[in-house]
Amino acid sequence: MCQSHPEQTELTQEYLDSLAALAHSTVPNEQELRASALPHGWQVEEGQTPAPYRAELYRDETGGGIAQEPSGEGTRRRSTKGDNGRSRNLVFPPAPEPLPYAIVDNHTHMDLLDGEVEITARDALDTGEKLGIGAIVQVGCDIPSSLYAVAAARADRRVLAAIAIHPNTAPDLESAGTLDEALETLDALAAEPRVRAIGETGLDYFRTGEEGVEAQQRSFREHIRLARKHGLALQIHDRQAHDDVVRILLEEGAPEHTVFHCYSGGAELARICNEQGWYMSFAGTVTFKNSKDIQESLRMARPELILAETDAPFLTPHPFRGRPNASYMTNYTVRFMAAHREQSLEDLCQMIRANSVRVYGSWGIEGF
């Protein structure tokens, strides 16, 4: 889930290099990361907001908030208003107990900022790692965020990249006559070795009206073809469009590893996913009290097809719904999933990690 970004940038080596430099300023390379002496020790204490996420550590003498570093190019900020138009609680939730077995957050947006302080990607990765989220997939929704994903994956081995044009962005690009150019850019980026998925792509009939359906469907088909061409996984954004998503996947031929990001279907879609071998990735929405269909799908899902994600900074799990989200919060979602499936937490974590590596390949770090 992310909003469109209007600017399109020509894919040149100079621009890629500049974005890689940006990511290095946000996510240092592994050697720099391990050698750095971090202020406050970035302690993670159960029941307390992790130190990098605590605004009181970044107050100036006037009481104003101070960002850890300038946000700069490549980052955007989530609205401080909720869907109901009211101000949200911008305090990050407390840390849970670390997971018994490290897993993957297979869909997150580190470039989208939220909360009282700006969290560097390095600190987000460190906090997640301490709480059992050992690796992530950074997901693009347009050309700038896809370039950011590639640069972040180059800069830190805990990150792999997914690249795409979001379905809500596709109609605007089609109207501007630049959709094909954007797809050509993705085709070039897909050759990067740490790009492991095309996504998030798909169909969204909730935010885009009938006038945008044709462009969304054309874009979705082209993304499927890109994933197949490059042998990459496909991450699908599917909102109120289950029937057409399934139809187009079957018509085009779904990639071997097809993932329904932030799974939102019910029993019938779960049955189809089980039959086709498509993965179901569960976000914080599975914990919501009104998500009975998603919870039923979780119970139905074949174990080898289950993944977990945050879609951070969105979709924070219950009981912190509406507050800022980050990869460490996958921990809460997975605990709910284990309880709901009546499965041991350790077994579920091992299963999610194995499934994630099967879909995306190796991160090149121990255990992943």
Residue spans for each PLM region:
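Mid-domain alpha/beta scaffold segments of enzyme catalytic cores
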Residues: 1-368
